[in-house]
Design a protein with these regions (language model features):
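Active-site-adjacent loop/helix segments that line or gate small-molecule/cofactor pockets in enzymes
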Residues: 1-21, 38, 161-162
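Generic detector of well-ordered alpha-helical segments enriched in charged/polar residues
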Residues: 1-3, 53, 57, 152, ...
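Glycine-rich, flexible loop/turn motifs
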Residues: 6, 13, 33, 41, ...
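Short secondary-structure boundary/capping elements
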Residues: 17, 48, 74, 161-164
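Short, acidic, Ser/Thr-enriched surface-loop or helix-capping motifs
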Residues: 27-28
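Glycine-rich loop-to-alpha-helix module at the N-terminal edge of alpha/beta enzyme cores
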Residues: 32-118
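PLP-dependent aspartate aminotransferase-fold enzymes
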Residues: 80-171
Length: 171
């Protein structure tokens, strides 16, 4: 059905989805499914949500993507709205959660280096956490099942701790 030609991060079900409406998905045979996963938590508005479809269509008719060497009018407008809502002074746009986490790791490492040098470069993460599928985000993920030997060596200076284990941070 395709599961032999499409490489997947997870074991796939032998179901080929065709379309969705709201929280309901339909496979190629018309069988109905309730999407409790919400596309692994990225489809919070559901499938085929008309205001979102219209906004994406309108933007795609103007321009699909602007290389990050340039600014875009809608990007700046959105950044201004985010900054006003949060009170922050700048915003980073990425393409995925893993990319956002990678940027956060770099910012944390830079801050640590500028405020303590080599001794302040450890990044602490929590047991049972998940941070993404890049090598650094896998390293940060606090679940051994995501650390197979075939992906080694993993990034250095990550430490997984139990929630609220303040002693582990101080040592």
């Amino acid at each position: 059905m395709g599961s032999k030609i499409v490489v997947n991060n997870y074991g796939s079900f032998d179901v080929k989805m065709a379309y969705g409406q709201g929280s309901t998905c339909y496979d190629v045979d018309g069988k109905k499914y309730i999407d409790f996963l919400a596309g692994i938590a990225v489809n919070s508005l559901g499938h085929n949500f008309k205001p979102l479809v219209d906004a994406i269509s309108a933007q795609a008719a103007r321009q699909i993507h602007v290389c990050n060497y340039f600014l875009s009018d809608v990007g700046v407008e959105f950044a201004e709205k985010l900054l006003k809502a949060t009170g922050f002074s700048s915003v980073y746009f990425g393409n995925s959660g893993a990319e956002g986490n990678e940027a956060a790791f770099k910012l944390a490492r830079k801050y640590g280096y500028l405020n303590g040098g080599e001794k302040r470069r450890t990044i602490y993460t929590l047991e049972s956490s998940f941070h993404g599928r890049t090598l650094a985000t896998l390293t940060a993920t606090g679940q051994e099942k995501f650390h197979p030997a075939c992906f080694a060596p993993y990034a250095e200076h990550f430490k997984t701790i139990k929630p609220n284990d303040w002693k582990a941070i101080k040592t």
